[in-house]
């Protein structure tokens, strides 16, 4: 361990593995239900390019305060997962927007309030991959530093797309927030 006198910019540089993970080097894949009647190949090809923003998920452990003689013993409670949100660039064929709306509508129809009741049918999976800057040759596949696999996702919210006469030099985008059962963290060599 470095002593206080050894903590300098050169030592910091040597500790920053890979030059630091970059927030703009990521890729998202989302599996859509086959029952939607849409071209899954077209959507799967576009998602990694048009998902503009995502997040590495949060998870939380609840807290159970147990009082004892004027003190409180904090005991770990149950795990919960925050919803996962992605931001999607909208192109003129609306293919991803259409798929998200159909997926949401298949769960609870806009007009009839009926829909698919079996989670096995409407819940799917997704991945967010943190990519490395490292590459030896142009065209080499990206190196994955870490991957998060979401199980049991479904769209909870498909956001609005603001329209505005004054909006110049902009491409439409929208957000989708997913609920999910859990996620797994995967390294390039297997589970952590």
What is the predicted function of each stretch?
Residues 1-192:
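Glycine-rich, low-complexity intrinsically disordered segments
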